[in-house]
């Protein structure tokens, strides 16, 4: 009875814990864990295989080798349990205690723990304020350190070499004390008075001026405070007692042939014990100092190797020259404890096999081979057989199953019915890589997979394998069915579009069915119903593509769900009428009355899901698939060599191009064009020739001319198999057809440059040897790229998951009024992403009004679904402020309103949804489709960079954004501001186009003027940068002396002379200090002011500026005073694809970033120094000036006296995300990262919802730096979680104290993962040693808030279905913290309670 109680108590104790704390172990604590001291290095007696006494495997210390049996065999069996044998001293108990009982080694001399010594920054070094080098010299017995200076002139912690030590001894005798080795460090650490030191440092912090010193002191202060608050003592960083790992965790296994396989740890422990024993003996013998010293040093080294081999000096190697695996290596890396055993476990009840197609399956089914099913469902079968009375015992049931009796198969059928199994295909890149299906038993040995789920798994049937897992418990089955069933995962979580769209054969079949052919058999017939059409087709009276008139019946569902039927006669084809049979009621016939390509089918399924819901869509998808397969078979579409029709024009086009190339070659040889120009031109010629050939080929392939019934020629789309496959989207693309029947075109070298001789042949004609050789470059590079790409993409996904893993939806609404402003994305003349796609499924943050009125169209907190988006489009709303996770105010999670719609389900997101992991998977999964290369701009691409005008594509009216302009004498506008944009607005006020226009642009139209499509409305010179005057007057040259600060040059062709300003470096000593400029003066010679300011109109001229005017010339507003030639911008490599995405998420600073204005104010230039200019910004309100040194070679966008706004670009270049955050705020940095990431994915045609990227950005922004501490506990300059500061500030405000102020900080995803509050999560990610060292010193405790920590400790995760469990536990915990009144109870009541408890325990078993 007593034992049972004990057992129950134990059970509950291990289960409930709310956190894990890590700290330093004191020597006494280590001794208290230990079950005895290990004194001998022996392991086991290799003849008897019995462990040696007091050795590393001693049974007396660690427990018995056999269950319930002592070593000498005196006590055996369960009845003696708990007895300690008096002969061999072994406790009689289970063997598994050898996995948990620890021993210890009493070290003869203290030893420093290498983690606290060597992991940077060295904790011991910080604590003692000594350099690591010095401490190492003390520890490894190279020099002395003063411990107690006494009355001498020495200082504590001073280093003494052997000689200086002897000198000091002679001088002071034993007044002072100096030692070497870990004892010395131990004494120094023991002497530190933490409280006093902390007070002293806090006092001196404000008065420290030097930045580096302040940083150092802050670091040291933080470490001291960590020790102080955690209750760790600094001297515990030095070990006096070494714990010994339980023997079963470092096993020694006898192999056959008398050899042993052993864990490396045993070797390392043996070295430590050997050296320790030798040192003890030497100390007893009072050996000479030098010998003892050497032995101590060796002991220190062996303990170092045991804790972290290879951290200091060379790693100790075993017999086979491989470094031994130390304790630190056991936990870190991919093979370490965290990633191998805690985060990745193996699963029982699983099997794997090759997959094949199951075209007859329903969407929720999979074919499971009988053999596999029998094995996987064994326990269920045994249970059923026994329950039926077909077998008396489990053993008999086993025999039956082994013999495969007939009844077994019947039982298997029953067991399997409606018991879902999970199928998984590696690599599992997103959550759709594991889905649940109902198994259908099949013969054969391959798993059958439904073709429509292949896209989600990224599976094909060329030998892929899949794994099957069986959910055992009822809850697991329930979750598999409700959440993971393939029929419940129709939409992709990445973009909310159907993921089960048909592909390949199915698309081809449906496309073929829905095509029309002129003069088809049965053309022009009238049918009264679809049934009649079917009959006509079956009897052969009408063929599939015949154009006919049919009366169809459509079901219309109105808003209230009322169904009504209506009939109409439509012009359609036989095939489309047949398709309408499988169309679910409630969808319009128009959806199938068209050529059904892949896009159309996808849209059809999407419409079906939104209008009719899940069930109808699933049934419809299956029907589509069966129909598609059927008609694809009937169509007999196949690829023959005659299908690749080579256009007749090809040869003339190629000949023309060759002639042009020859001409250019001649021009080059006569010196009219440079080599670079020739190369670019040649490539352009070939590129356009290739385009022409492919255009001719596509026209040839895609249409054929027929004579219809009326005898008129009519063009119709051709039934060429290759064309049909490409046009329907089943397989292949125009580019691939071009290589088959056009010309292969230009090829690239491995370094990315284009070879100027193209391949004019195509695959139909065949390639010659040279052409084939040129082609191999690209193919080979493609394969090499793919291999690299997979690894890189996987690593990106891992980092993303790690940074976002703990983000879960935890409440309905945080009530914030903030949000992101969403506008349609417009680049040049194209709308890249319309507003509806950006706001669909989001929640409105600020009321949206009808344009131009105060009436609310969409109130705050509206979830914008398809219907709302249509409304917004009708009223041509141009921008909406929507809620976003970035601005969400929830602590430790996000709220449903800020996230909006769950993309995979189509309704607002549920509590407990792990949005962080979903976001990481959605971004990481398409990673393998991105390219790896950096693009070098060359050839055709360089033409686009020298744009010089804006030509509009749509008619509308002109609108300027943040532009300053002046009107010149011709009445045209001249732009005099940077980063201005010009937009075209249609009559409804919607923005259609948007262009960046540079400084000095001349606009042909005034603002608000109407423009026609095709107008050129803005011009500028792309090669020079003008300086435009804003006032009219006459010009005066200042400091412009011929031959000193400028030279005159005369143009050979025109004969005009111009003035060129010399660069400072080219001037003589006289001109160094001069600053050439142009002043504008009125008729009376007085300075003119810039309009609206008190600043005189003076324009400084930088080096190499060209002035075309003479002194005293008259000038009008908007004229150019001077031009600064732009060096053709260095061809910057554009980082594209995966590396670009990684750079953005890691928030890496680009090389030569754009320089942004730190404050708003007026620009002026200070004294120049060697190679740099000094830029000064003076704020208008008379605040402090801001100075920055900028290298001379940077092209500046600003002139002296110009006004800039904070965050405006001063020098062009790629913008750094950190600068944007600092100067323009969170919203701008969020928009910047989202748009940049989306650009990369959009280029590859991958759709990802912005939400997912925002989720990652939220995690990158979760830290902040304290700028002023107020009355809080924080230190200035400390990096803290934003949520912690917010919570602390709320409390401070309630108490009427001063809250802390902070600045948000942007961290890259790796940094952000390592900086999480949870040390378990950080340690399992990267840099395990560093993270654990830091956590231990600070005595951190992990509240197990994220998903990863809970997986590691083996609990349900606080997301999904585990969210409820955690919520109830937290509520209970909050209750428990309130004081409880304890009731006293009598003995009989206690007995009664116990009886109830036992009954309960019995019923639960």
From Swiss-Prot:
It catalyses: RNA(n) + a ribonucleoside 5'-triphosphate = RNA(n+1) + diphosphate. Binds 1 Mg(2+) ion per subunit. It is an enzyme of class 2 (transferase). Zn(2+) 2 binds at residues 814, 888, 895, 898. Mg(2+) binds at residues 460, 462, 464. One of its GO terms (biological process) is DNA-templated transcription. The keyword Chloroplast does not apply. GO terms for cellular component: DNA-directed RNA polymerase complex. Zn(2+) 1 binds at residues 70, 72, 85, 88. Pfam families: RNA_pol_Rpb1_1, RNA_pol_Rpb1_2, RNA_pol_Rpb1_3, RNA_pol_Rpb1_4, RNA_pol_Rpb1_5. SUPFAM superfamilies: beta and beta-prime subunits of DNA dependent RNA-polymerase (SSF64484). InterPro entries: DNA-dir_RpoC_beta_prime (IPR045867), DNA-dir_RpoC_beta_prime_bact (IPR012754), RNA_pol_asu (IPR000722), RNA_pol_N (IPR006592), RNA_pol_Rpb1_1 (IPR007080), RNA_pol_Rpb1_3 (IPR007066), RNA_pol_Rpb1_3_sf (IPR042102), RNA_pol_Rpb1_4 (IPR007083). Its EC number is 2.7.7.6. It comes from the Bacteria. Keywords: DNA-directed RNA polymerase, Magnesium, Metal-binding, Nucleotidyltransferase, Transcription, Transferase, Zinc. GO terms for molecular function: DNA binding; DNA-directed RNA polymerase activity; magnesium ion binding; zinc ion binding. Its cofactor is Mg(2+); Zn(2+). The keyword NADP does not apply. The RNAP catalytic core consists of 2 alpha, 1 beta, 1 beta' and 1 omega subunit. When a sigma factor is associated with the core the holoenzyme is formed, which can initiate transcription. Belongs to the RNA polymerase beta' chain family. DNA-dependent RNA polymerase catalyzes the transcription of DNA into RNA using the four ribonucleoside triphosphates as substrates. This is DNA-directed RNA polymerase subunit beta'. It comes from Shewanella oneidensis (strain ATCC 700550 / JCM 31522 / CIP 106686 / LMG 19005 / NCIMB 14063 / MR-1). The gene is rpoC.
